[in-house]
């Protein structure tokens, strides 16, 4: 089974233990992943698409008061509704990376926890009276 297919099944199905592990590890590694995304990955993605900072990509849904700088922070402070899709892109990439890291960790933990297949128990020894009856039968056949 390919790792992409396993990851998709993990992300879609999962179970309570996987979710609990994800929450705990996600909380612990959230800042590290945020730094990796914002400091390492998003600048490269930004260079490819011509924008270095995705957090300032937005669509204004109202009128901007005169004299307000055209930045996301300033427009939000002015109370103008905005659709901040750049921030969403950053958060979505952050989520995918974090989910993949958790998936790999849970996969490794599950690999360690897998039990070796249990061999079926040996059939019980034939009772002595049955063995004697078989011996008698075999001796009568001769």
Curated annotation (Swiss-Prot):
Which residue ranges does UniProt annotate as crossing the membrane? 10-30, 40-60, 86-106
Q: What is its main location?
A: membrane
> What membrane topology was assigned to this protein in its record?
Multi-pass membrane protein
InterPro entries noted in UniProt: Mechanosensitive_channel_CS, MS_channel, MSC/AndL, MscL_channel
Q: Which GO terms describe its cellular component?
A: plasma membrane
Keyword terms, alphabetized? Cell inner membrane, Cell membrane, Ion channel, Ion transport, Membrane, Transmembrane, Transmembrane helix, Transport
Ion transport keyword on record: yes
Q: Please name the GO terms that the record assigns under molecular function.
A: mechanosensitive monoatomic ion channel activity
The answer to whether the entry has keyword Transport is: yes
Assembly notes:
Homopentamer.
The family this protein is said to belong to? Belongs to the MscL family.
* Task performed by this protein: Channel that opens in response to stretch forces in the membrane lipid bilayer. May participate in the regulation of osmotic pressure changes within the cell.
Q: What is this protein called?
A: Large-conductance mechanosensitive channel
């Amino acid at each position: 089974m390919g790792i992409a297919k396993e990851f998709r099944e993990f992300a879609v199905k999962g179970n309570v233990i996987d979710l609990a592990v994800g929450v705990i590890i996600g909380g612990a590694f959230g800042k590290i992943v945020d730094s990796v995304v914002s400091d390492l990955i998003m600048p490269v993605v930004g260079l490819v698409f011509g924008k270095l900072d995705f957090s300032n990509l937005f669509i204004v849904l109202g009128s901007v008061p005169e004299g307000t700088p055209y930045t996301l922070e300033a427009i939000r402070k002015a109370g103008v509704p905005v659709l901040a899709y750049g921030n969403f892109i950053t958060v979505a990439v952050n989520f995918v990376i974090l989910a993949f890291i958790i998936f790999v960790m849970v996969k490794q933990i599950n690999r360690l926890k897998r039990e070796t297949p249990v061999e079926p128990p040996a059939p019980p020894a034939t009772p002595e009276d049955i063995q004697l009856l078989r011996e008698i039968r075999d001796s009568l056949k001769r």
